[in-house]
């Protein structure tokens, strides 16, 4: 097998694992939510709790990822996570009992974390070991692709008149198809500390202060992300002037996210990772607010494109940075970052669901998301400013060191 073909198959396995674990097992719930509310009697409060339970599962999965160090165990958990994604997708269509849905959403969250963190770690580790550029733009295109696929599928199945159960079973069939290459083309991990060419792969962790601020910023980004990602279909479906367009808007999120990660990789090369993250955070605030600032389908779609293009880009940049700090065990810091992101995702949907039950709609949640994103973006801007200053000081410090050495 040639190196180019190997890289293609590894990246394809990673992309399809994200389409399965995140797009189908996790995000199909969002475009199906209005249908389940109409046909299965799912209330707005219960919808929020189910979303939170899913994110709790994701949070637990992230905790496990941050603690697991054995590469072989990571590989096994990645594969078990994808199988869990298939089983839990099927379970959603089998029963109408809320407790069954809750268990299913929790395990789906575990599977999503496994595919996201262990799968991403395996891909990044393989790229670094084989002396490829340590960028995950193509890989994280699977998140946007998964969102687009689930939204387009729900739109098509709604036109065919399929009920909520049939749609979950259709997604189960898709999940089975995706599982085969996602498992077969992901290579077993290599636990050595050098690349194939013999170059060392030393871990270079950030300072505790940097990590604390970075975690806080990512927590805020988690709030900004999860409210829109979970409730945007229900929100848009109830807005005057754009009612019934929620699934189309969700499709736009996926369309915006699929190619965006590659673009953000290019922006990061010019601005640095932190500069790209700061810009993405600012644009995401605009994307969150556009659907509710004016009852216009054009603005709602533009907001969705911005939201999808920035949220997936931010996740890609953050997890790529985390993996570079720990190239031999990329999932270690990825798990810590995702714990922060996941904690926000576990809290915010339940609060949004409660607010929706109180106020009668979900729009208050979007304003909360925008405020949280503003705080997170400010923290990222602060880290970027410190990074710029340190980059400017580095040559001067090196020159001083050389001058001192020369004078001895």
Language model features: what each stretch is:
Residues 60-97:
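Conserved MFS/SLC helix-loop-helix module at the cytosolic interface between two early adjacent transmembrane helices
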Residues 61-73, 260-272, 356-357:
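Helix-to-loop junctions at the C-terminal end of transmembrane segments
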Residues 104-142:
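Cytoplasmic helix-loop-helix junction between adjacent transmembrane helices
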Residues 272-321:
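C-terminal transmembrane helical hairpin of 12-TM major facilitator-type secondary transporters
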Residues 41, 73, 94-100, 294-295, ...:
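Helix-breaking motifs and short loop linkers at transmembrane-helix boundaries and internal kinks
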Residues 30, 210-251, 255-259:
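Extracytoplasmic gate region of multi-pass secondary transporters
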Residues 98, 129-187:
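Helix-loop-helix hairpin linking two adjacent transmembrane segments in secondary transporters
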Residues 328-361, 369:
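A late C-terminal transmembrane helix in Major Facilitator Superfamily
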């Amino acid at each position: 097998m040639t190196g180019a073909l190997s890289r293609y198959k590894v990246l394809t396995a990673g992309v399809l694992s994200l389409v399965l674990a995140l797009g189908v097992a996790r995000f199909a719930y969002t475009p199906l939510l209005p249908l389940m509310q109409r046909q299965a009697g799912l209330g707005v409060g219960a919808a929020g709790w189910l979303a939170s339970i899913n994110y709790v599962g994701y949070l637990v999965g992230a905790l496990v990822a941050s603690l697991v160090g054995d590469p072989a165990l990571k590989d096994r958990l990645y594969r078990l996570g994808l199988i869990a994604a298939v089983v839990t997708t099927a379970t959603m269509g089998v029963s109408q009992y809320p407790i069954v849905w809750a268990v299913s959403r929790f395990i789906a969250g575990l599977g999503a974390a496994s595919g996201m963190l262990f799968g991403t770690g395996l891909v990044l580790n393989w790229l670094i070991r084989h002396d490829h550029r340590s960028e995950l733009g193509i890989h994280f295109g699977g998140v946007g692709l998964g969102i687009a696929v689930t939204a387009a599928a729900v739109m098509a199945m709604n036109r065919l008149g399929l009920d909520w159960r049939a749609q979950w079973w259709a997604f189960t069939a898709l999940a089975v198809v995706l599982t085969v290459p996602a498992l077969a083309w992901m290579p077993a991990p290599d636990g050595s500390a050098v690349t194939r060419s013999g170059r060392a792969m030393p871990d270079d962790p950030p300072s505790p202060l940097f990590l604390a601020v970075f975690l806080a910023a990512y927590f805020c980004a988690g709030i900004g992300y999860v409210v829109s990602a979970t409730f945007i279909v229900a929100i848009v479906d109830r807005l005057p002037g754009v009612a019934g367009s929620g699934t189309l808007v969700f499709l736009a999120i996926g369309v915006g996210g699929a190619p965006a990660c590659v673009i953000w990789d290019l922006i990061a090369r010019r601005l640095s990772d932190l500069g790209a993250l700061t810009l993405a955070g600012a644009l995401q605030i605009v994307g969150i607010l556009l659907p509710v600032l004016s009852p216009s389908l054009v603005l709602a779609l533009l907001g969705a494109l911005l939201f999808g293009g920035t949220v997936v880009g931010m996740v890609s940049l953050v997890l790529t940075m985390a993996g570079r700090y720990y190239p031999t065990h990329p999932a270690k810091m990825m798990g810590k970052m995702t714990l922060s992101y996941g904690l926000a995702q576990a809290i915010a949907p339940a609060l949004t669901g409660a607010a929706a039950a109180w106020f009668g709609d979900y729009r208050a949640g979007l304003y909360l998301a925008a405020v949280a994103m503003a705080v997170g973006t400010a923290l990222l801007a602060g880290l970027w400013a410190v990074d710029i200053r340190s980059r400017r000081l580095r040559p001067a410090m090196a020159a001083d060191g050389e001058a001192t050495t020369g004078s001895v």
